[in-house]
Amino acid sequence: MLAEVQGDPPNPDPLRRRCCGCARKPSSRKAQKKGTFWGIEVAETLQWRGWELGKEVIKHLVLKNVHEKTQKLSYRCPSTRFFITVFPQPIALSPGMSLTLPVIFRPTEKRDYEDSICFQKAEGEFSVTLRAVLPHPCLSFPAAVQLPLCAVHSATETTFTVRNVGDLTTVFAWETPSPFSMTPEHGVLSVGAECTVKVLFQPKAAAVCNVIATCWFGVEEKQKRTMQLRAQAKYPYLQVNVPGEQHKGAQPGKLQDVLCFGSVPVGTSVEKCVEILNMSAVDAPCMIERAKDPLLQDHVFSCDVSHAVVPAKGKLALCIRFQPQAVGEHSTDYFTVTPTGCLQQTVLKMVGSCKGPLVSLHQSSVDFDWINLGESSTQMLKISNVSDVPAYYQFDIDGRGSVFSLDRPCGVLEGTTTLVLKVTFRPAHPISYHRRVVCLVHHQEPLYVDFFGTCHSDTAKPAILQARHLSWYRTNTVRGLTFYPPDILSVMLKDGKLLMDEKRALMLLPEIPLDKPPKEYTEASSMSEYFYDGISSDLALFPPHVSVSPREHDFGRCVPLCKAEPLPLCVTNHTKGKITVAWTPSYGSAFQVTPESCDIPPLKSSAFRVLFQPTQLNSLYAAELEGFAFYKVLRQYSNIEEDATICPPWCLTIRLRAHTYEAKREHFIPQYLLDVPKTFPPVASDTDTYCSALLSNTGTSMITFSVNQAACPSVLVKPHSGHIMPGGHQIFFLSTRPVNTVSQQHILPLQLNSYPGYTKEIVLRSCAESLLLLLEGDGKLYFKPVCIGTSSTQRYTIKNCTRLPMAFTWKIHLSDSKLLSVRPAAGLLQPYEAMAQAWTFTPDNVTKYLLRAVVFVGWESPAPVSPQSIHYNLRIIGEGALGTIRAQKEHMDLGNVLVGNLKDCSMVLLNDGICSLQYILSVEQLITGLCDPEEVCSDPMALELEHSRGTIPARSKAFVRVTVRPARQLHYTWSISYAICTPAVPDLASTKAEQHPLCCIEATGVHPTIRIAAACSAGSASGISRLLLWRLLSLDTLNEYLQRDPAPSELTYRVPTRHSTCLIPPIYTPLQLDFNFGAAPIGSEPALVMLLLVNNGVVPVEWAFLFPSDQKMDMEHWAEDANLSPRELHQMRIQDNQLFSVSPKSGKLLPGQEEAVQLSHRHDFVGTDHLPVLLKASYGHEILLNFRGVTVEKEQRYVHFASSKHLLTPIAIGTSHPPVQIYELYNGGSTTVMFEVQLDSITRVQKDNYQHPVFICLTPRGEIAPGTTGHIEWIFSPLEARTYLVDVPIHILGGDSALITFQGEGYDPKATGESATFREVLSPSVLLGSTKLTVPGQAASLSHHRICFGNIPDRTRASRLVFLNNISEDKAVVFTWRTGSVKDNEVLQIAPEQGVVQPRGSTPCFITLQPSGRVSLYSADLVCEVYIQESLVQYERDLQEWEREKERQAVEFTITEQDLRETAHLCEPSAVVRKYKTLPPVKNHPAANQPAGHLQRRLLSSKEASHVWVKPEPPRPILLHLDVTARSHSTEDFFSNFTSEFPKYFLPRPSIHQVLFVDGSVDRNRMEKDPEWLSLATASKEELQIVTDLLIGVIRDLLENTQFHDAVRRSLQEPIPYFSQFQREETAKTQHRGQCSTIPSSLSASPDLFTEENGERKETSQESSPSNDVLGSWEGLSEVLRHEQLREQKMMMKRQPAFGSLVEMVLENTLQNILVEASCGEVVLTAQPKVIALPPRPFRSLARLRSQCQGCLCRREVAADCSLLTPKAISSLSE
């Protein structure tokens, strides 16, 4: 047994190391522990033991150099005076050399001493401990002992060693707490001795034991030391399992505890094994014993093992032996497997039956017909054994003395064989012969066969005996007519005293009552016929017609041979006719009967003699004599008048024995085998029981046997005596009739060979069985409280305690039959079988019940309920109650569940009642969301219950596992109800009316979704704007599709799988998108595209970009297809050269998580590259992305068209100012390209639409710089609500042309009732951008990548704030904004346009949009060029050095060279730096350091480069794209479509001339009608610039000319201006107010009219002089009028356009300053406002009227007396 023993804790290190780095190596010597320190090997401790006072003890410390170099060291002496060594001196040790240092110990007192010697080396110090200790006891043993797991009530043990490591002999004693014990508990250990101690763990309960054992040791002074004992005890759990075939009725998958042997041949034994399984983690000792049962039972089941140990988690094979003894007996027995402690019992049931031979005769009679005297006849008799058990058979006939003989009268009939026997008929007299011969079979009832035949002679010819005569004879015997001879029967038949039935058998006249039928012959059992012969027993089936006495006789010892006395034999005729007895002569036999034949009158007897004539001494003699008695009238057939009166003869037999052994001569020793059972088969009281015995003669001599029937009269044996030939056998049948149930022993003496010394006592036991049924629980059955209307089933066991099969029947009172039922109600219990019955109790009221049931039991043969049966009462106690079920959580939300995936939860059902409840659960499903109700109503149930029905015990809970699997991306609601399962509600279909709501479960089916949140480009695609990039990659369509539900074909492979066998995998996705990387010249930098993937769903998503090679399965080379298509070759070239790459190619995103993915296209080969890449989201979408990239030759003119079809924004019909729309062209080449739009098709469309210009191209020609995007402006003006198409050729000068289809849609706003098109400036997916996406090497980022101004009125200003953030930690950046076109410069303003951003800093940039007066759809790409400031500074230095070198070389070339002009011209800078004019120093940049595909711009050859420096190139900027979108509307359109938004914008008030010029209708009409306007719109930049400069000069001159201003002013002051009729109404009113306001200006010219002093003076004068009241009131009125005039003037000023523009600018600058300060943290916009309490106002008179000046910010109070105001004054005030 294994145990874990933990050693002593390590002692403190005796060596005190003074520095780190020393490596100590333990020595292999046990006597002295050594260590190695920097190559010096030395003992760690020197210890002195057994020292005495006054003596010096010397020990030597050895130092050895184990290093390969010479070691030098020194040491210091011990610090105390008790340890002395030699004076310190330097030590040098060569490799392998040793030094011995003596240490002297001088003690002065008895105590412990400790010191050390310190050694110094260059590497550090180490010390050796010197210790001297007193003699003391010390024991060494482990600190802790772990014992193995142990079963409760079992024991486990382990051992450990206790060693005396002290200096004294010591005693020890253990104190161990329970359940541990030590052996030995105490002892004595001498110095250095050790002993083994055993720890025994005997737990009584399951627990983890962790105790402390104490060891006391020492002689004078007791010391103790503790040990920790750890062990764990567990309860064993044993189960029995029968391997192999399952028992009938057993549930599959469960352990079988019934061992079925089946049918086993009698006398044989069969072994089968069962497994005892130990389900626990501990070894389980157990006992195997037989269940307690009566002692009378024969133990046909046996097991040799009574105690065993089953290993933990293992099994034990147990062999059970079955050896049945009685044929047809069904055996049942039980073994119990009980673990130690009787904690649990496991019962093993064993069943088996005994089978024997099944022998039958093919015919019941053998008819020899008739033969002549002296002849013989042979017939065949077949005997078969249909069983597989061998059968011993014997025909009870002696062929030597009978007219009938068999060739094999006895033998063994093997299983399933048939034997053909020859029966020979040799008659000795001319008479009829009939003998009924019994065939005895061991372990089977006897068989009977009739031998009959007729012998004729010349003188005697009796009637021929036939089979019908035997049948008539048996019927006549029953009717009592066979005692009359045939002649008398014939007379009675003639006289009518006898009749014949339908079978022609004789019968007497019918008796009263007439309906009583005549008696018929019925076959008796073979055993009854065999034993009830009137000879072996006193009973007989029928009275004998002829009897002979004696039937058996033993002549005894007949010596000398001539003195054998004859045996008198008496034959009696019991019939009423004269009979003749003829004996069959036995030729060669020592026994003869005289006379051979004799007639016997009716009812008379006749005497015969049996003579015994032996021929030799010391021999055994035995024989059977045969004779036939018949009616004398049957000797001649002519005497028979009626065939039905023929009566067969009766056979008489006599068994004779004798021997001629002399008196002192020992008889022959018999050699035999006796097979006899130990007990009689069980029967009921006063019933016959039978068994057979087999006596086999295994010797070479005949054996005679005799059973002393008188010695045991209670047992009948047949035959009583006889003989057995050598090799033969004799079958006995024994019978007894037990009366009581007390076991009775029977002893039968069997004497062999007529010698008392050869007597074998056969001991048999018999016992009558009485009905005994064992009821479980003393006949009481308790039911737990049961819910009304429901049923409770309880198991109740009854056991047959007898050895006979017992039938039972339960009777329940009729009134209780509705409440109580049992299954099965009747049945058969095999011997000692226990049956568990199912009792069902169904209460119907809330009450307690006391019911009674009766079981009637009886034997199997009669009816169970009969006078012979008995009954037992069973009391049933139960209670009816009410109960309900509730859910612990009435509402459960499972949240989001992946569509097609499983999610489960536990639904807890609570039963708070006192009764168990059987329930049935039902589920109703409700699907809500954006779906078709008719389509989803047919969906299968997406919720599955682990079990829909079950039982909850009282006051307990049940867990139901709920699994949901949504099939759609919708919201699911399941309402779960329950119904109590009752006989009225047996299943779910019957529960509709009994439903009770239980709980509600919700879940939402979701698909894993991702979307592209942002995209940016770099490398050769850095010039592509974000909006164009978004369209090139079809990201709108991709995002839109990613939000849909995946198609079933997309879920063919739910996760990325290698499923294709070809290079081009099959396509299962319904969507294919183009991922266009644009175009670039060959050798350019790779086009980089950064995509930001966002998991916008609620479940994690795994995504992957799968190239065709990622979808192909790995196959052997021979399986590959060698014939590749051009498409496959193209894809292989792309993948092999890695022209397209994705990094990372896969990942996993949690909800809300983002990840950047880099896509690249390398421009290594000229042409168009295509590669299908599958974007796969596990359990979601898979979309085929066609990667496409174009590589062109250098200097090739190439314009990349995003698509061949362009959709213009839909325009409402009747729109007076249709917006300008743009079509983008991207120049993917390296040179500037010119394009021209062919307008012929546009003219045709205009002609088809009544000369209405549906399509107007504003930029029919233009140029596009390399790597930039050009715009073609269009105006779409529909005439009807329909779709317009036009195919427009676009020619690229020096390049390819393209035919682009422009499609526009006109709609009727009145019909649609909405203006949605106005509101859809950009799609929502485009608006949502992320600023977290950066390209490699990006040093700055924008706070927004896209700005949408939305819909704005024309000529208004709108501003947005964007922050430029420097994400670098230590480098400042320089930025410069640039726009894409002249038009963008006109409408967009950026402040600041350039600047420097410090590390980790940010700069606010204000983007202001002011439409230029033409309604347009604005889509501008603002590019922020960002440089690292250090790189610019370095570039400036390099450029300055290069310029100085250039000047120096120019001088040198002027003197020495003739081509200086060309060189100078060649080295001129080709670019102009806008801000920084200096260049960095000249450096020779090797090609290896340049990026891949970089276009080298060296201007000198390699030869010239050695003399002239190459001009340094400016650093490449980082391009940050800012997309600005907006749509401008005319004021009228904006007001009509966006009324609520109109007040948010400031509309500048232009002059009359401006209004007339900018009027949209006039301007648009002029554009449409004047052809020259179109040519002006298509003018070049230079032409437009000239016109602009001229107009600016003219306008500036007019604004500066004062004479012009005066002339305009004078014209406005004319009485009736000529053009006043054209002015607006509001202008006229304003001018009228202005004229009116000038009237009282002279009156208001007094400067002191409204001073405070004058006001106070007038007030005091009013109080002092009443005569001045009227004058004061008029003065107050004039003051009010003057204030009104001032207010009117200020209002006029506010209405001026200049004033509004000024206020707008002030407000705009104020808000911008606030935002800038807030971004710097100076202002907190979200802080709570502070409230300052103002002081209270002083009290003023209520008579004072408060009025406020309109148009100013002051508040004045004017005193007024209402009584002094006249009506005229009031009217003036009101005016």
From Swiss-Prot:
What does the record say about the knockout? Loss of the expression of CFAP65 in testis which is associated with an inversion breakpoint into intron 3 of the gene may be responsible for the infertility associated with the Rose-comb trait.
Q: Name one GO biological process term.
A: flagellated sperm motility
Q: Where is this region: Disordered?
A: 1627-1672
- Keyword NADP belongs to the record: no
Predominant location of this chain? membrane
Q: Where is the composition biased (Polar residues)?
A: 1633-1645
InterPro entries cross-referenced by the UniProt entry? ASH, CFAP65, HYDIN_VesB_CFA65-like_Ig, Ig-like_fold, Ig_CFAP65_10th
Keywords linked to the UniProt accession: Cell membrane, Cell projection, Cilium, Cilium biogenesis/degradation, Cytoplasm, Cytoplasmic vesicle, Flagellum, Membrane, Transmembrane, Transmembrane helix
Question: Where is this gene product found?
Answer: Cell projection, Cilium, Flagellum membrane; Cytoplasm; Cytoplasmic vesicle, Secretory vesicle, Acrosome membrane
Start and end of every MSP domain? 1331-1460
Would the keyword Transmembrane helix turn up in this protein's UniProt record? yes
Q: In which tissues is it expressed?
A: Expressed in testis.
Q: Name one GO cellular component term.
A: acrosomal membrane
Q: How does it sit in the membrane?
A: Single-pass membrane protein; Single-pass type I membrane protein
Q: Name one Pfam family in it.
A: Ig_CFAP65_4th
**TM segment ranges:** 84-104
Please report which protein family the annotation says this sequence is part of.
Answer: Belongs to the CFAP65 family.
Instruction: Say what the protein does.
Output: Plays a role in flagellar formation and sperm motility.
User: What's the protein here called?
Assistant: Cilia- and flagella-associated protein 65
Organism of provenance = Gallus gallus
Q: Which gene encodes it?
A: CFAP65
